[in-house]
Amino acid sequence: MKEKSKNAGRTRREKENSEFYELAKLLPLPSAITSQSDKASIIRLTTSYLKMRIVFPEGLGESWGHVSRTTSLENVGRELGSHLLQTLDGFIFVVAPDGKILYISETASVHLGLSQEELTGNSIYEYIHPADHDEMTAVLTAHQPYHSHFVHEYEMERSFFLRMKCVLAKANAGLTCGGYKVIHCSGYLKIRQYSLDMSPFDGCYQNVGLVAVGHSLPPSAVTEIKLHSNMFMFRASLDMKLIFLDSRVAELTGYEPQDLIEKTLYHHVHSCDTFHLRCAHHLLLVKGQVTTKYYRFLAKQGGWVWVQSYATIVHNSRSSRPHCIVSVNYVLTDTEYKGLQLSLDQAASTKPSFTYNSPSNPVTENRRVGKSRVSRTKTKTRLSPYSQYPGFPTDRSESDQDSPWGGSPLTDSASPQLLEQCEGIESSCVYRQFSDPRSLCYGLPLTEDHHTSNELYSHPHSESCERGCCKAGRYFLGTPQPGREAWWGAARSVLPLPKSSPENGDSFEGVSPHIASIHSLQVRGHWDEDSAVSSAPDGGSASDSGDRFRADQCRSSPQEPSKIETLIRATQQMIKEEESRLQLRKLPTDVPLEPTNSLAKSFHSTDFPQSAMQSVVCRGPAQVISPAPSPVPLSRLSSPLPDRLSKGKDFLQNELSSSQLPLTGTCAVSPTPALYSLHPRQYLEKHAAYSLTSYALEHLYEADTFRGYSLGCSGSSHYDMTTHLRKAEQAPGHKGTSVIITNGS
């Protein structure tokens, strides 16, 4: 009996083993694996295989008993399937809703060191980091669709990162942390409607499983990856502030590495993609490696390029603490939407190539050492009050900071800022408050050197010229009065010279303002220091009242009466009294006014309507005639002490006298721009009506001086605006010619 029972048990086990071996042979696995599998493994693999048929009911076609109705293209895909798995830098896996691994490709052993047989049929939770269990559960959770009765089967995309157990040696494992390796998984959750029409399954859906591909992120030696032409690398701190960038970033995005260093990556990413980048950044800090979604990196010239980044946290070799982030970035497209500005950096890069700040000149800096301490005092840069115009530069020039008077209240708080492009034929000036700069009249182009060049450009006046009234003048002084009084008071647009000139070796402080009123022919050759610049009785400048300006900024506002308006009214009254005396003399009326200073005759007329003046902005090759033709405001002129007047005196004797022409004819003027000066500090001659001090004109000049001046005015009765052109002493950043518009008497 015992022998029979032993034989029966042995036979039963042999049959059982034989059935298991037969079952193992049916598994779609290599015989080398199935022949060494135990019974439990065979049962586990078989169960997984059967569940896979639920996920893919059509299976492999004919091999599962179904008639093949596939096209030739699908057959080619099946034939290439095994080869695709070998070339895939990752592995494919299918996970059931309960977490069981239904299938995993044999390439998983290359990345994890775990065999296909070992992983299949076991729970995925056994091979992932405990901190990732909740995330995996959320991935496997399905949601009911909104219109379930219209959909029989649908898929939900999934993309996530798992820290999976890795048993490879350190030399082959890449970057691992505590025996876990970061795997980027992407795939879809398959949802299908129940095939049973009976209750309670009618209209319900079942979660079939997750089908995904796992990719190993770049190993720790990211810097050893060969960077192709469409790749660049950067190193950043843990808060994504860029520390180092590869030089290829300039070719791909337009930004030089130094433009991006010390700036956060979020600053240069499209605002719609910052959320995805933030999520990737969070995963990177938690798991150590991440692959970002496709995001738009803003290009310097506008628009963006599509980028995907593979980021890794590098740990300190000694302390094993996170040290920095190293990212390899793949630029996937060319620049899209070029010219579309989405950030301030892009806007700054497309602004005109001019700036208020002149580049420092070493020669000028060396010569500036011996100057007074006051002239070298730097003041804090003031911000422009016109913040609603971000497209224009708001910084002030360096010479303005050097001025001992600082800036005047009107220039700092109310005057329109002038933009000047000092290079190129199309140099022009634009006011900020001019909504349409095209309405301005562009006349009288100036050549680079008017003494040698005869090339002038004609300008036909049109209706736009009539609309070009001087808004700046009306803003400061109100509506100008018609007639000669307006010409007398308003035709004094004075331009200061540049700050320094490397050629003559004189700095700005040693050059007196080249400002004068051209008198008649009888007194043309006589110049003295007082005729060039008005001086106060104490030897200082008549306009040396910067402290008083700063104390009366609010009162000097053009919105309420100020010293400017008071002095203008007094000056206009004085001019009217002088004209009453001038009317006693007969005016010659038969000789027209000839063009002066080598200007084309086409720009002059024989009469001028007694009406409100118009603003004429002249566009020339390298110079602008405007209310303030230089970005250097008039307040930067130094105090005209006697030792600073030699330069201006020589200039006035030699050049102004040589270019002045005798004027005869009727009360005719050329339509040269008669503009209000943008800056109130004008250093005029005897009739300086715009001197913004607390003195009246009687305080600045004696009675005999005014009497002599009145007699000189009675000698001739015509008015003239003589445009004197002079080659400017060019300083770095201020190129072009200097223009002085004066009126002679």
Swiss-Prot record:
Keyword terms, alphabetized: Developmental protein, Differentiation, DNA-binding, Neurogenesis, Nucleus, Repeat, Transcription, Transcription regulation
GO biological process: axon guidance; diencephalon development; dopaminergic neuron differentiation; hypothalamus cell differentiation; pronephric proximal tubule development; pronephros development; proximal straight tubule development; regulation of transcription by RNA polymerase II
Protein known as: Single-minded homolog 1-A
Assembly notes: Efficient DNA binding requires dimerization with another bHLH protein. Heterodimer of sim1a and arnt.
Domain Single-minded C-terminal, first and last residues per copy: 336-745
Domain PAS: 77-147, 218-288
Biased composition annotated in UniProt, kind: Low complexity: 532-544
Regions of compositional bias (Basic residues) in chain numbering: 369-381
GO molecular function, one term: DNA-binding transcription factor activity, RNA polymerase II-specific
Gene3D superfamilies linked to this entry: Helix-loop-helix DNA-binding domain, PAS domain
Residue span, bHLH domain: 1-53
Tissue spec: Expressed in embryonic forebrain at the eleven somite stage. Detected in brain throughout embryonic development.
Role noted for this protein: Transcriptional factor that may have pleiotropic effects during embryogenesis and in the adult.
Annotated GO CC locations: nucleus
Positions occupied by motif Nuclear localization signal: 368-387
Polar residues bias spans: 350-364
Record organism: Danio rerio (Zebrafish)
Localization, UniProt: Nucleus
Source lineage: Eukaryota, Metazoa, Chordata, Craniata, Vertebrata
Spans annotated as Disordered: 350-413, 529-563
One protein family per Pfam: SIM_C
